[in-house]
Amino acid sequence: MLILFVEYHTAFRQAASYMLDQEVDLVVVSQASSVAEGREKMAQGGIDTAIVDIPLPDEGASELVRDLHEANPSVPVLVMTHIEDEAIHKKFVEAGASEVLPKTMTYEEILAAVRRLGDELLR
């Protein structure tokens, strides 16, 4: 599965990408640190799923999720956040996120969610 990872914390994004790349079936093919950069990477294509952290430093993370979903509805978008507000989670699901996960999850739980989304692609 080819992944676009959008996260503004460089160390977290790089570490998580490295860990995902160690999995035989996953490759982080593109990384972005902002909505603007995420849009650029999205336009390049070649992704099977996207992981988007919220909030992002520039405004419009929900629009990025909407753009990702509208550009290719078959590409699942996984949103990760430290925000525990159900209204915000609902906003991102309505924008097209397949799932909204708390950043307090373990790596194994995140990995399971990514693979679950990948399995949906194969259906």
Question: Which ranges hold each PLM region?
Answer:
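C-terminal output helix
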Residues: A87, M105-R115
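The C-terminal output helix
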Residues: R115-R123
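Conserved acidic segment of CheY-like receiver
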Residues: M1-A11, A16, L20, A50
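Conserved phosphotransfer microenvironments
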Residues: I51-L68
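Acidic, metal-coordinating helix/loop segments flanking the phosphotransfer/catalytic sites
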Residues: Q31-T49
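Conserved phosphotransfer cores of two-component systems
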Residues: A43-G45, L68-S74, A95
